[in-house]
Structure formats: C-alpha cells, structure tokens
C-alpha cells in the first residue's frame, strides 16, 4: 500500500519498485486539496489514468478532506478507470481550539456510503477517525454489495497535470525532431536545452495538444539526452508527450522517467520490434504507435499495411495491451515520389478504423517533402485523412 502521496512521479517510482521486486497486490492513494489537485498539482484524472496504466490493483484517495468534500475527486477518478477505488478520508477538519475533528461517526459513514456508486470497494478512515468510525462504516455497508464499474473508458494519455482524451482529432506537434533541421541538430550536439524548450513552447502555443519528442543523433548519447529533454519539457509544458525512438534502451529510459501516461512512437510489424517493444509498453502503462511496416519494408498496397496493423494489434493484446491504446500509423509517403501511395495510405487508414476499431496516427508533413506550396499540400492531405478517420495528425 502506497498512501498519502502528493507527487505522481514519486508514486510511479514506488509502483515500479514494488512490481520489480514482488508480486503482491498494489493499492495506491493520493491526497488532494480543496482545489481538486494534490499539493504538486496532480489531478484525480491524471492519477487514475497513469496508475491504471501501470497496473495497480486499486487506487483512490486518503487523508485530504472529509468524505463530505471528496465526491468531486472520487467522481473524476471513476470516469477514467474501472479499477476498484479506495477511500480513507479524514473526519473533516480539526477545530483550532479543541483539536477535535468536526465530522462524527454517523455522518462520516453516511457520506462514505454515498460514494459507493463510483466503484468504491475499500473503505477506511484517516486523520481524526478511530475504531468507532470504522465500526459505524462496517454496520452501514454490511448488507451492500460492491458495484464494479464496467463502463467504456475513453482512450487517454496524460502528463502529471493534464489529460488528453483521444475522442476526436488531437494534434501532435512534430518540431522536436532533428530530421532535416540543422539548428535542432546543433542544439543536441551543444546540449542547448533552451532551444529545444523554445520549440516545445512554440508548438503548444500553435495548438499542439501532444508533443512528439525525438532526439536521435549519431553524435550524442541518445538515452541520456532523451531523459534530459523529457524532464526539461515537462518542467515548462503541461501537455502529454510522445516518446519517439527506435532504440529499446532509449525507449525504456524515456518510459521510465516520464511523469504520466505517454505515447510511445513506435513499434512495427518486425518480430524483433514486437518482441522487444510491446513488453515495455505494457510494463510502463503507455499507449503505442504501430507502424504498418515489417521486415519486408512498407507494403505498396492498403491490404498489406492493414494486415501488418492487424498483426500488431493482435500481438499487443496478447501481452495485455488494450487495442484502444494502439494507434496505427499507415505511413505517409512523399507524393512526389509515390503518387499512388497516397490513396493506399488513406484506404488502409479507413480499414483500420472501421475493421480494427483502432485509433490512427499519421505524419502528415511527409506527404509534401520536396514540393513547393507545402502548406497547401499538407492541409489538403490532412483534410482527406481526417475524412477517413485520422485521430492523431503529427504536424507543425
């Protein structure tokens, strides 16, 4: 049991430590203020999304406030998880003169019982409670049955403070990537984190709801740089991040040090990629982009890409990853070189949405590489892709 936590990063470390050293059930509870957030700014939604992804057995709230003030917190948590919830509230607040708490056992039990409808399974008391409170709760719930939650939970990713629900198109900012960017490459080599942060802030100000983070460069230690950049961006931006790398050691470092539930970009249909990357996605509770390519490269046909996408989804589900956390990228090829490929990409995207029921992702800007009027080409293709069901365009 990890309780009275205010920092999601610290709680993530505790959960990973437990999972890596034992196989016991894990219960986690955080402490929230009257503003609905922890002392470090964590929302109930971010806590629920992150901890559910990490695979805890129950989560909830302890200490904090009296049970009469906890309904907004418990309700918000319940929206983002079907796990059993835990409530161990204070007996209200202490009187500054007598130091006695202001909620008596009868009222405490009444308030707690009003929260059972949100999927609360574990009930207790924290500051100001005593055996009389627990006895009263027990008598009130003796004839009640636990009401497990079976609702559909939206696909979500989060930072420690902001949840993004993937229930419509969500823009992923593409500029934190050295490909074709001389100044960005120079910033990586010179360890110029300020330049990278400027790019991140610019993307958020331009409307990005998620940021792709790629720091791959042959002249640097990509693993160390990924951790450094993730921490730096999370210190100034509250949007969720997408960790972009092909190297397993970089992927794991990024997933381990990220605060919240990220997207991993990416896994593909190659056996080595499936066997290496998917277990990491499961362990760290992330979502993952699945690229529709394999050992034979990128199929020229929509059918070929769809079959790889289907294989990725099946393998993900085999290791315990819900298909709602798999975002298929049917791959955008440069239209100047592969003019027929655009149609195949859109057809594959449509099939993934309608037949697999998965969210979709595309690097939109690839379509116009080497062409004039890139913005016009990009937005035209983006419109066509969204018409076919694109959820996550990666764009500037």
Give the residues covered by each predicted segment.
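Domain-level signal for soluble alpha/beta catalytic cores
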Residues: 1-329, 333-396
């Amino acid at each position: 049991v990890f309780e009275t936590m205010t920092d999601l990063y610290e709680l993530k470390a505790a959960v990973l430590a437990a999972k890596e050293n034992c196989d016991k059930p894990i219960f986690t509870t955080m402490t929230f203020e009257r503003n609905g957030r922890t002392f470090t700014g964590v929302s109930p939604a971010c806590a629920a999304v992150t901890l559910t992804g990490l695979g805890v057995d129950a989560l909830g709230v302890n200490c904090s406030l009296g049970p009469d003030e906890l309904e907004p917190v418990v309700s918000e948590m319940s929206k983002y998880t079907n796990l059993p919830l835990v409530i161990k509230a204070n007996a209200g607040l202490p009187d500054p003169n007598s130091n006695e708490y202001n909620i008596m056992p009868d009222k405490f039990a009444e308030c707690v019982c009003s929260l059972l409808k949100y999927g609360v399974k574990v009930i207790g008391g924290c500051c100001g409670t005593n055996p009389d409170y627990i006895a009263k709760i027990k008598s009130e719930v003796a004839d009640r049955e636990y009401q497990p939650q079976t609702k559909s939970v939206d696909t979500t990713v989060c930072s420690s403070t902001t949840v993004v629900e993937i229930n419509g198109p969500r823009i992923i900012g593409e500029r934190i990537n050295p490909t074709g960017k001389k100044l960005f490459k120079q910033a990586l080599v010179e360890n110029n984190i300020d330049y990278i942060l400027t790019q991140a802030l610019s993307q958020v100000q331009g409307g990005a709801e998620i940021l792709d983070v790629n720091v791959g460069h042959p002249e640097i230690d990509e693993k160390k740089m990924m951790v450094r950049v993730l921490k730096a961006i999370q210190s100034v931006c509250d949007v969720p991040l997408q960790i972009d790398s092909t190297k397993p050691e970089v992927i794991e470092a990024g997933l381990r040090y990220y605060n919240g539930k990220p997207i991993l970009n990416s896994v593909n249909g190659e056996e080595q990629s499936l066997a290496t990357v998917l277990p990491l996605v499961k362990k760290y509770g992330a979502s993952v982009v699945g690229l529709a390519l394999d050992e034979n490269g990128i199929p020229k046909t929509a059918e070929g890409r769809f079959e790889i996408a289907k294989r990725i989804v099946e393998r993900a589900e085999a290791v315990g990853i819900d298909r709602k956390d798999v975002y298929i990228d049917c791959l955008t090829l440069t239209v100047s070189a592969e003019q027929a490929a655009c149609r195949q990409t859109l057809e594959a995207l449509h099939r993934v949405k309608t037949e697999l029921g998965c969210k979709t992702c595309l690097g939109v800007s690839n379509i116009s590489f080497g062409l004039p009027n890139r913005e016009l080409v990009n937005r035209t293709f983006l419109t066509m892709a969204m018409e076919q069901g694109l959820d996550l365009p990666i764009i500037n």
